[in-house]
Amino acid sequence: MATPTSSPTPDLTRAAEVIDLARRVVGKGVRTLAAQGGPDVHQVLAYDLAHSAAAVETARSLIDYGGKGKSEALITCAFVADMLHEVSTRLLGREDMWGVEQNPLASAHDFMTAFREPEFLASLASVAGPRHLEDEFEMVQDTFRSFATKVIAPHAEHVHRHNADVPEEIISGLAELGAFGLSVPSEYGGFSEGGDGEYMANCIATEELSRASLGIGGSLITRPEILTRALVNGGTEAQKQEWLPKLASAEVMAAVAVTEPDYGSDVANLTTMAVKGTNEEGVEGYIINGVKTWCTFAARANVLMLLARTDPDRSKTHRGLSLFIVPKPLGDAHGFMFKQPGGGKMEGRPIDTIGYRGMHSYEIAIENWFVPADHLIGEESGLGKGFYYQMSGFENGRLQTAARAVGVMQASYESAIEYANNRKAFGHNIAEYQLTQAKLGRMAVITQASRQFSYTVAKLMGKGEGQMEASMVKAYVCKAAEWVSREAMQIHGGFGYAEEYSVSRLFVDARVLSIFEGADETLCLKVIARRLVEESAAK
């Protein structure tokens, strides 16, 4: 049983000092990494530094939040202590690798001790903390939570257990709410007026939909969002007029065809080719050949956003890639094969997965598939720019994935606290035991910290900034979701392993978060660590 105790007094000034200390230590590690050959040479060091830097930035984003009230300050101090513990754990025994002295974080140990006390964490078990959203975003949250609760949640378990399809009522309902037009500029039939509002609205909506179901909720708006960003950044005016209104209304649903069997996160070296040619009617365009994999929602989608090599010179790597909008018929979720009059063929094989079910993922073999020339994003001026257009969409995709992770965490926490308050063991509800309370407290703290960091990144991206932070929030929050969902399952005991409890679905769904939208290792080594080294050299 937990022993009642008074909480330590939150000290945000001291918390900021602790964050600054951790930041300086990580900075020394980055400079050492740069001096010794960089991320490709010292991958373990680079990975640890990337995750440490992401944890530090998560903590830094909480300082303003902590100043808004007592519970907010307690959550902030608890997370800063948790961050310090994570960085210390990665550093311990590797001080020489980092290029730092022994115990470089020792001056902050008193803070870590005070705010990692089991009694203190236990006191936070039911302190989720307010979100502090502006009125317009409160409305977004209420609207999407209501829809998710009434329409998505009732289908979540059936779709997961039977690997069923996304019900059409969910797609049509989201379309009526304008979910697919949140990032489409208003002049093209969407709701975006620019600024941080569109990123925040998307982030909040995605969390609420994912809280009900990752597979048939939060992920539905990600793929149209990625194509929308690519069109806004690189499309011709005619292409924007043609496609953006259809994406906003869900008349057109999109899937992303980038990854290949031998080229997962190594996008720059993919091999699918698009060669200029004509169809049987003499229309000019491109003929595509290659194999794409992990194309989620490809059967139900009307178009594929497909990245292909238009320059046969492989030495040009990412500079030889172009981005296409590839129309296709609707297909059967269990597999599909389409033929064009001129002989083109597209065949999709479903990939069975342990979780994240409903949208279904496919390996797609494409043979002599014709697309008109005006389906190349940017048309002639878009040749060789596909990688950049795609990445502009993926950056926001990483933020959305973090928001999806927050939704899964929130659902996991709610499931755990409800079960703990009703399950008795040894004569008491398990929620009364200190170990359970401490777990719930840490879950609440990490979930709110992850949410606030995602809000911070959304605001940065609304200003045209935050590309690095988008990768960091994805790296930190998705790993955190694995821990939160695991502990939620553990609190359920044996019932957590039973399909009749939703926490088992949340656990397997959470596992995909650090794999898709940029595998964690690739994100840390090729994006975060590399950028940290570049920034260090520029100082």
Language model segments and positions:
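FAD-binding core of flavoproteins
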Residues: 1-17, 27, 132-133, 196, ...
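Alpha-helical interface subdomain recognition
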Residues: 2-211, 222, 234, 239, ...
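N-terminal glycine-rich flavin-associated loop
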Residues: 217-238, 264
